[in-house]
Amino acid sequence: MIGIFVVLPVVGLSRLDTFALPEVLRYAGLVLLPAGAALSYTSFWFFIRHGRGTAFPTDPPRELVVRGPYLYVRNPMYIGNLAIIFGAALCFRSAAVLVYAVAMCVVTHLYVTLSEEPVLDRRYRDSYARYVSTTRRWLPRWSHGSAIARAERSGRPI
């Protein structure tokens, strides 16, 4: 999936144009690329290991995954993929890839809120409702600790 929605468009679009960019931002892109890949692959591994499934619709996790990166944010795999695209836009100084990255943010948000979250709500019911109440969709709540720690402090297991 990463190849279809991340690598192929980035490689193709990166050759269309370039824009002026301070060198420091190109280096930021060099950090975002591997960081995004690491987050994406780690998130996928947690789906396999702790969810006993994958990110593919044909083999979804059998258990709600609330460990690893999912302690801090509900969609770390998507965040990792988007970081790869933004990193590539900065590295290649590509306006087309930057526009693609912004478009993918919008598409991903709409997909998650309109399609994925209702399915997760039906599949995991109360566990998912508790998880949603303690863990943000896109931005981690660093100052308050993890979803698990907050739930344990309140006496509510996830």
Question: Which residues are covered by each model-predicted region?
Answer:
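Solvent-exposed interhelical
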Residues: Y70
